[in-house]
């Protein structure tokens, strides 16, 4: 069983948990207390010198960065390639969505909400505009689409649903974006591990209360 270092409130950690559920892999979950500095202990730095979560250790093989872990789990343990198809064009679209999630959508969340939550900084209206812009892009990607990349559930949907659900508990109005809202309501029903994802979201929500 693979060791999985995580926090339940973390969106990237939740995307890995849902992917593992989708491919039927059980994770040996190890909570890492970042506030206590557990990620900076020598034993963890040996595993991941970048000292980030999520981190997976599968039979001695250590990997971090959630989207890399998602792809690894599907390629190693998936009974089919449906979550990350081998077709170069299908895979390219999935990769684009994953990079969009990492570099644009979730980054906009971090830039706007993290300073407020962790540094008690005032809200930055310019950073909020970046969130709105990211959702407008996602809304366009999802025009006429039931799924984020192709005609079935993929790791792109799983990564994006982890992010979008985090926006929801932060109080962002997803319903303003009709295509995103429709996709999200469906994703809640069809994504394996959604319940655990939502429980983690509610943990994260405590930072906003």
Swiss-Prot record:
It holds the Pfam family GST_N. It catalyses: RX + glutathione = an S-substituted glutathione + a halide anion + H(+); 1,1,1-trichloro-2,2-bis(4-chlorophenyl)ethane = 1,1-dichloro-2,2-bis(4-chlorophenyl)ethylene + chloride + H(+). One of its GO terms (biological process) is glutathione metabolic process. Glutathione binds at residues 10, 51-53, 65-67. Its EC number is 2.5.1.18, 4.5.1.1. PROSITE patterns: GST_CTER, GST_NTER. Residues 1-81 form the GST N-terminal domain. Residues 87-209 form the GST C-terminal domain. Keywords: Lyase, Transferase. Disulfide bonds: none annotated. InterPro entries: Glutathione-S-Trfase_C-like (IPR010987), Glutathione-S-Trfase_C_sf (IPR036282), Glutathione_S-Trfase (IPR040079), Glutathione_S-Trfase_N (IPR004045), GST_C (IPR004046), Thioredoxin-like_sf (IPR036249). GO terms for molecular function: DDT-dehydrochlorinase activity; glutathione peroxidase activity; glutathione transferase activity. The keyword Phosphoprotein does not apply. PANTHER family: GLUTATHIONE S TRANSFERASE D10, ISOFORM A-RELATED (PTHR43969:SF9). Homodimer. Conjugation of reduced glutathione to a wide number of exogenous and endogenous hydrophobic electrophiles. Has DDT dehydrochlorinase activity. Belongs to the GST superfamily. Theta family. This is Glutathione S-transferase 1-1. It comes from Drosophila sechellia (Fruit fly). The gene is GstD1.
